[in-house]
Amino acid sequence: MKKFDKSIAAFEEAQDLMPGGVNSPVRAFKSVGMNPLFMERGKGSKVYDIDGNEYIDYVLSWGPLIHGHANNRVVEALKAVAEKGTSFGAPTEIENKLAKLVIERVPSIEIVRMVNSGTEATMSALRLARGYTGRNKILKFIGCYHGHGDSLLIKAGSGVATLGLPDSPGVPEGVAKNTITVAYNDLESVKYAFEQFGDDIACVIVEPVAGNMGVVPPQPGFLEGLREVTEQNGALLIFDEVMTGFRVAYNCGQGYYGVTPDLTCLGKVIGGGLPVGAYGGKAEIMRQVAPSGPIYQAGTLSGNPLAMAAGYETLVQLTPESYVEFERKAEMLEAGLRKAAEKHGIPHHINRAGSMIGIFFTDEPVINYDAAKSSNLEFFAAYYREMVEQGVFLPPSQFEGLFLSTAHSDADIEATIAAAEIAMSKLKA
């Protein structure tokens, strides 16, 4: 049995200092029934907690670390930038360098604005869509997470397409009423929503792959249908690629699925492990953003040289060949997990998109949030705890997917499959 004495003590102290002892809710490990692991360091595919335990890491800071921990080129770039100054409140050339890479690789982006988080990117994109179209309502999908902006913390009421109700105290009902929610992968509900409210829908915002349901890819024709419906009704299509951007493919989710939105939100990978976000799209739309246009958005640390340097060094190391290797590794891990579950007769469904993998303990195909919720959460929690004992660090939530990095070796994947085999053999009874 691993010892976690130092992590337990650190969490006890943290609970007197921060809400729930953490600075982001999922880090509290509540859904898996254990104390959070306090990390001390990471290198490559491995992380080490303050008790000295080593883990193969599939959290990767919730996706940004596509080259693993403490990537040499990223670290050296950060050192070089920090020695010259961490932030100036003025433009720097490194902003141009990262912006050029983003524009070259993302089909929808002609102009990009850097911000500090994925939430900031989606909030800004919604304001831009409303300002550009002169409309008020947005349409989002149940179970798709787009950050913690008021317009996006909304759950559905009854019916296939309803005006939303707040999903968190503090979200005004007046704000929520401008958010329409429908089921992910349900194109007919989208069409119905446009029949009811189409003249006032500014945009549809969607994750090309629903990452916060535990990895749920789009059904064939779904994204294409969204593109068609929005064009027919004069609404903008926004892809939230904070999670999928540069992870599922060299040209992001939109390149992977061959559907080009009007606006794209980015984050995670483009910061190389530092706080960052971005939104971009057609020049005609993006030129409405201040100071080119009247739609305001600003940020003290937006485009700061540390984040830009880390993002640039992260992206330049990604080539089309990188994604061929990601596909090979991800297929290997997916097949191994499936084989382990089948061997022990454990109900399961595995989804994958590029280097994102989600395993659900259910017989039901997982194509939307309701199906994701059918997973056996108690079994997942027990599986999670056993995987920790076996030295594998997974996202501590059923509704988060695994991420692979260029640093993961075949030996890492083989060890992970062996750990899953042990975990499932212990839990099958």
From Swiss-Prot:
It catalyses: (S)-4-amino-5-oxopentanoate = 5-aminolevulinate. Its cofactor is pyridoxal 5'-phosphate. GO terms for cellular component: cytoplasm. It is found in: Cytoplasm. PROSITE patterns: AA_TRANSFER_CLASS_3. GO terms for molecular function: glutamate-1-semialdehyde 2,1-aminomutase activity; pyridoxal phosphate binding; transaminase activity. Its EC number is 5.4.3.8. Coiled coil: none annotated. Pfam families: Aminotran_3. Keywords: Cytoplasm, Isomerase, Porphyrin biosynthesis, Pyridoxal phosphate. InterPro entries: 4pyrrol_synth_GluAld_NH2Trfase, Aminotrans_3, Aminotrans_3_PPA_site, PyrdxlP-dep_Trfase, PyrdxlP-dep_Trfase_major, PyrdxlP-dep_Trfase_small. The keyword Cytoplasm applies. It comes from the Bacteria. The modification N6-(pyridoxal phosphate)lysine is found at K268. Pathway: Porphyrin-containing compound metabolism; protoporphyrin-IX biosynthesis; 5-aminolevulinate from L-glutamyl-tRNA(Glu): step 2/2. Homodimer. This is Glutamate-1-semialdehyde 2,1-aminomutase 2.
